[in-house]
């Protein structure tokens, strides 16, 4: 989110920006730690491009990805937070050649596990901040999931708690590069899809939540 990047950028020290493949990477220090901050763009390709550039060009050793997602569980409501235990690509489908749905060829995995240490740290940070949150599977795909039928299918197939468009691509890049990774998502809509929100108002609140979690996480590691 642009708003979240702006919040964190304003708190960074010795910040400089490099643009690679159309993505702005902000390099500096935050809460005493060297960080690289970027807004990848929408979809799995941009997300993977951003993550791979962070690893190869800027030498990051961990990645935490934040953003918004739709809830797939009645335990998470608008403004709550989902933390990944694993990510899946719900639109990956090679069942025509005998594979199970969601299988990523080459690495032969469906679930891309989050780093348990980072996920546990984010869990503790959210608890300390009194943010309602759940750990679970986050499902990603290059489509905006807006029908009840698709949501029900994703839950029944992958037991996912939230759905969005980027996290699993970053998880795959991190897995093949052996980089610890976890994702956090602020919930933007209810499981039923019935509750409507003012998007710009929500984005500001979501950015405040996710940037606060990021800062608390960095402070806890200082």
Residue ranges of predicted features:
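A C-terminal functional module that forms or caps the active site or interfaces directly
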Residues: 144-192
């Amino acid at each position: 989110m642009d708003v979240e990047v702006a919040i964190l950028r304003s708190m960074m020290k010795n910040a400089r920006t490099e643009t690679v493949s159309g993505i702005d990477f902000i390099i500096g220090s935050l809460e005493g730690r060297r960080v690289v901050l970027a807004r990848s763009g929408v979809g799995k390709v941009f997300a993977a491009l951003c993550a791979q550039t962070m690893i190869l060009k800027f030498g990051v050793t961990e990645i935490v990805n934040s953003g918004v997602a739709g809830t797939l569980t009645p335990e998470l409501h608008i403004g709550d937070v989902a933390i990944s235990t694993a990510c899946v690509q719900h639109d990956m489908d090679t069942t025509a050649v005998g594979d199970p749905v969601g299988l990523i060829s080459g690495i032969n995995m469906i679930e891309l596990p989050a780093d348990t240490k980072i996920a546990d740290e984010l869990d503790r940070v959210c608890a300390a901040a009194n943010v309602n949150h759940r750990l679970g599977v986050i499902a990603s795909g290059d489509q905006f999931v807006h029908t009840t039928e698709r949501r029900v299918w994703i839950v029944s197939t992958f037991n996912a708690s939230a759905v969005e468009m980027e996290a699993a691509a970053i998880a795959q890049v991190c897995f093949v590069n052996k980089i610890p990774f976890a994702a956090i998502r602020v919930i933007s809509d209810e499981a039923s899809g019935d509750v409507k929100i003012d998007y710009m108002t929500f984005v500001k609140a979501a950015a405040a939540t996710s940037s606060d979690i990021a800062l608390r996480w960095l402070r806890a590691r200082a």
